[in-house]
């Protein structure tokens, strides 16, 4: 039988940098996992307060 592709649920979206499915930051259509986001957030223009 042919494999079906999921079109909904948590596993559909992946990090566009490393492919991880957990801890995804989807706000502002960023689609990065939290690990990748922490590494490149400053380069994207985000600033860390205190």
From Swiss-Prot:
One of its GO terms (molecular function) is rRNA binding. Binds 1 zinc ion per subunit. Zn(2+) binds at residues 15, 18, 33, 36. Transmembrane segments: none annotated. The keyword Nucleotide-binding does not apply. It holds the Pfam family Ribosomal_S14. GO terms for biological process: cytoplasmic translation. InterPro entries: Ribosomal_uS14, Ribosomal_uS14_arc, Ribosomal_uS14_CS, RIbosomal_uS14_euk_arc, Ribosomal_uS14_sf. GO terms for cellular component: cytosolic small ribosomal subunit. Its cofactor is Zn(2+). Keywords: Metal-binding, Ribonucleoprotein, Ribosomal protein, RNA-binding, rRNA-binding, Zinc. It comes from the Archaea. PANTHER family: 40S RIBOSOMAL PROTEIN S29 (PTHR12010:SF2). Part of the 30S ribosomal subunit. NCBIfam families: PRK05766.1. Binds 16S rRNA, required for the assembly of 30S particles. Belongs to the universal ribosomal protein uS14 family. Zinc-binding uS14 subfamily. This is Small ribosomal subunit protein uS14. It comes from Methanosarcina barkeri (strain Fusaro / DSM 804).
């Amino acid at each position: 039988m042919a494999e079906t592709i999921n079109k909904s649920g948590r596993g559909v979206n992946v990090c566009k940098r490393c492919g991880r499915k957990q801890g995804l930051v989807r706000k502002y259509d960023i689609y990065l996992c939290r690990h990748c986001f922490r590494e490149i957030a400053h380069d994207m223009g985000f600033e860390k307060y205190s």
